[in-house]
């Protein structure tokens, strides 16, 4: 496995709608393995292919190390890591929850986002098997966050123009400080 370079805002690839994958083959599995390694290396819980400069509809997730205690949901209900190709999300109920989210493509930013609390996601798994998963709470939030990346939507897109500009300016200063070292 390899650690891939992370793409950060405002890179234009993050604003493109990613292309569907025809079939999950060995090269797609290798990409997913590399994405997972990259996610772990950067202490993330989810990663979408556009975040590593690949415009394909692929996400990986692993919330197993996140301490989740909400609505009697435990992480042990899900088998991690999750590999999702061409995920399609459908809300199961209209109930939403608002919480702060971080993003590997927007380092050191935490942005409040309202998302569906309970979803159903249909996707091709690691072995090209069509799979349906019902998720709620933080897993539902993480899936929706990563699917946003596949649709060219970033966390800052949920902010007003003024707050979005401030967040991107902060990110620019962080990048400049890192570059100067």
From Swiss-Prot:
InterPro entries: Peptide_deformylase, Peptide_deformylase_sf. Gene3D superfamilies: Peptide deformylase (3.90.45.10). The active site is at 146. One of its GO terms (biological process) is translation. GO terms for molecular function: metal ion binding; peptide deformylase activity. It catalyses: N-terminal N-formyl-L-methionyl-[peptide] + H2O = N-terminal L-methionyl-[peptide] + formate. Keywords: Hydrolase, Iron, Metal-binding, Protein biosynthesis. Its EC number is 3.5.1.88. Fe cation binds at residues 103, 145, 149. Binds 1 Fe(2+) ion. The keyword Metal-binding applies. Belongs to the polypeptide deformylase family. Removes the formyl group from the N-terminal Met of newly synthesized proteins. Requires at least a dipeptide for an efficient rate of reaction. N-terminal L-methionine is a prerequisite for activity but the enzyme has broad specificity at other positions. This is Peptide deformylase. The lineage of its organism: Bacteria, Pseudomonadati, Pseudomonadota, Alphaproteobacteria, Rickettsiales. The gene is def.
């Amino acid at each position: 496995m390899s650690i891939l370079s992370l793409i950060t805002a405002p890179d234009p690839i993050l604003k493109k709608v990613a292309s569907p994958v025809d079939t999950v083959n060995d090269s797609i599995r290798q990409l997913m393995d590399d994405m997972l390694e990259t996610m772990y290396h950067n202490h993330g819980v989810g990663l979408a292919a556009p975040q590593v400069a690949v415009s394909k509809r692929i996400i990986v997730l692993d919330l197993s190390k996140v301490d989740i205690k909400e609505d009697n949901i435990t992480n042990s209900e899900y088998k991690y890591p999750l590999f999702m190709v061409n995920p399609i999300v459908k809300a199961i109920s209209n109930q939403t929850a608002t919480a702060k989210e971080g993003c590997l493509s927007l380092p050191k930013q935490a942005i409040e986002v309202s998302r569906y609390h309970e979803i159903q996601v249909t996707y091709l798994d690691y072995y090209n098997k069509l799979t349906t998963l019902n998720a709620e709470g933080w897993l539902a939030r993480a899936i929706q966050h990563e699917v946003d990346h596949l649709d060219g939507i970033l966390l800052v897109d949920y902010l007003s123009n003024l707050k979005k500009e401030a967040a991107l300016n902060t990110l620019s200063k962080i990048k400049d400080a890192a570059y100067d070292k």
